């Protein structure tokens, strides 16, 4: 009998804020400093929508600890929640290379990292992430990183992905954020603009990429996880 592949899947649960908060409440709780950072960002930063979601934080904590990660990279720091999450998830020997191009938001991140007592774990690099990643490669750090989180300028994602693949070890994980673009990736009538074009292209590229095992999860605005095979 010829095998047929399903082409249409159904949503099992229609998510809303009540369900989201129930799930968060039944996960490892954020620390007081993480909650304070989130509240500060929502109250003081106009573009607070860029903040990593709470459910992502608990998810990344679990991934980092399952990997027994010692070396991570955070591409796109904003006010520092994702870097803080990684630093808290690792032991004292853990290190985070935090990549951003501006101090406008990272100046706040530095304060929260210090308050949490993890600032010594985080190396903030204020320059294009592609430059930082290439410097790490040039310093002989290929195949040594355990976890990379990409959440920065969408048109740069392909470059960050390729450089991260060189830096990640076999079995390490790259997490790529905003791969659903608020559902626009699946909407044929969506306004085509550079961010959407870049994300659609990367999604298709990763799907066909035989260097990695991959899964796309509808968490927050969509997260793709890839792990390097070779």
Curated annotation (Swiss-Prot):
S-adenosyl-L-methionine binds at residues 52, 74, 76-77, 82, 100, 129, 151, 153, 160. GO terms for biological process: methylation. Keywords: Metal-binding, Methyltransferase, S-adenosyl-L-methionine, Transferase. Gene3D superfamilies: Vaccinia Virus protein VP39 (3.40.50.150). A divalent metal cation binds at residues 151, 177-178. It catalyses: (E)-caffeoyl-CoA + S-adenosyl-L-methionine = (E)-feruloyl-CoA + S-adenosyl-L-homocysteine + H(+). One of its GO terms (molecular function) is caffeoyl-CoA O-methyltransferase activity. Pfam families: Methyltransf_3. It is an enzyme of class 2 (transferase). Its EC number is 2.1.1.104. Belongs to the class I-like SAM-binding methyltransferase superfamily. Cation-dependent O-methyltransferase family. CCoAMT subfamily. This is Probable caffeoyl-CoA O-methyltransferase 1. It comes from Dictyostelium discoideum (Social amoeba). The lineage of its organism: Eukaryota, Amoebozoa, Evosea, Eumycetozoa, Dictyostelia.
């Amino acid at each position: 009998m010829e095998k047929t592949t399903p082409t249409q899947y159904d949503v099992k649960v229609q998510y809303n804020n009540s369900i989201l908060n129930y799930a968060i409440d039944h996960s490892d709780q954020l620390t007081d400093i993480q909650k304070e950072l989130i509240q500060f960002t929502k109250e003081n930063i106009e573009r607070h929508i860029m903040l990593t979601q709470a459910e992502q934080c608990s998810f990344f904590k679990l991934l980092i600890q399952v990997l027994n990660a010692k070396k991570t990279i955070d591409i796109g720091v904003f006010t520092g929640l994702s870097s803080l999450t990684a630093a808290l998830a690792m032991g004292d020997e853990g290190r985070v290379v935090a990549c951003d191009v501006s101090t406008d938001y990272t100046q706040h991140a530095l304060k929260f990292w210090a308050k949490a007592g993890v600032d010594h774990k985080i190396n903030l690099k204020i320059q294009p992430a592609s430059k930082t990643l290439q410097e790490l490669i040039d310093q002989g750090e290929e195949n040594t990183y355990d976890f990379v989180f990409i959440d920065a300028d969408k048109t740069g994602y392909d470059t960050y992905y390729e450089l991260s693949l060189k830096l990640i070890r076999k079995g390490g994980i790259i997490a790529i954020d905003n791969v659903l673009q608020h559902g626009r990736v699946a909407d044929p009538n969506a306004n085509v603009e550079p961010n959407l074009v870049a994300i659609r292209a990367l999604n298709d590229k990763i799907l066909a990429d035989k260097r990695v095992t991959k899964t796309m999860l509808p968490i927050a605005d969509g997260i793709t996880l890839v792990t390097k095979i070779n």
